[in-house]
Amino acid sequence: MHYHRYVPFGLLKSEIEGADFFFAPNGRTDPEAELRASASAFGSDRPIGALHQNAQCAFPERFRFVKQALGLQYKEVPCPILDRFLAQFGSDPGAESVTLVFSGAQQDSPATMFGHTFFRINSRKKGQSELLDQGLSYAAIAPPDDGPLIFYWLGMTGGYHGHFSTMPYYLKVNEYTLAESRDLWEYKLSLTPEQTQTLLRHAWEIESNSWMSYYFFDGNCAYALLALLEVARPDWELTPFSLYVIPGEMVKRITRIPGAVTEVTYRPSLKKKLERKIKTLSSQERDDFYGVIRGERDPLSIDSSGVLDAAGIYFLFEKQKNDGKLPADLAYRMRLVLSRRSALGGASTVAPPAEPSAEALDSAPSTRPDLGHDEIQLG
């Protein structure tokens, strides 16, 4: 229910703001009244909320808690809309665990200066690439015509509603590492399948019935995900931040919990991938690379797969910078590069999205958020 006691007056209030989230008229400030009203509502057939669901379907995690805490018995009802929501994260047997994903800042974009965090929900489908798993994000819903001043003002003052959304993970990888040249750090969390289901059911409760105000420095993506994660792992005590929390601090807070993170992987942005590839070239190969991208060397005369891979990554990077388009001359050179690279055979490093690797993990420690300096804590 996300109740917190606010200083200096000691007011107890839920951070959830939509009225449909509460059954009692004073439920946002009175947990006992809300518990009694919830226990009654779960035995009613009256549809509630924007989706006109039975209360058991609208609040599946609260329903589970009330049954266990109060020892009550109910006639349970089918929940087809909820079932469809959960099925997108994997079925038979379903979602297995959660990975916290941190994206670095986008160059020349002040709105991304603190980075961004979201979850990848890991399914248990054998043989399926993790790129086909679903991402779960929390972000402000801002009208597209809001200018920068309005955007920053409303973001600072909680003028936007924050909402959860889902998207296939490969689209998130493409968005961040290709289109925006942002590194991705992945932290697999030690959640059990049941704890993962708890997290998803609670995300459903908030998203289908209510919202939270979005603030850049506290009620942001990092805080919302911490609050969601704390429902699944209350023993981690994730949300008592003094005044603000930004994505990098969220990552550090979780990684400092013994046993919370079981694996760390890194997906470099296309720009980092290009920089790393160029560093592996010999002096002559670098001359050939620059000759190819400047149009001074015929790609069909190049015998080095490393040069062609680097040139292919460069043209792909330029294409992403220009909204997926290349000038005719660059597009022609790129086709020649890819044709020559294919003729040489062997594994190519051009095709995105890149899979994480130990080599990549060791190559970029400076961008790893959990190894960065601590922020100054206010409050």
How should each PLM-predicted stretch be described?
Residues 1-78, 187, 202-378:
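Activation targets extended, charge/polar-rich intrinsically disordered C-terminal tails
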Residues 151-222, 232:
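N-terminal accessory/precursor segments of enzymes
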Residues 86-89, 104-108, 363-367:
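Generic recognition of flexible, low-complexity loop/linker segments
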Residues 94-181:
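Glycine-rich catalytic cores of cysteine/serine-nucleophile enzymes that process amide/ester linkages
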Residues 88-97, 110-112, 116, 192-203:
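Active-site-adjacent bridging/hinge elements
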Residues 79-83, 93-103, 358-361:
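Short linear interaction motifs
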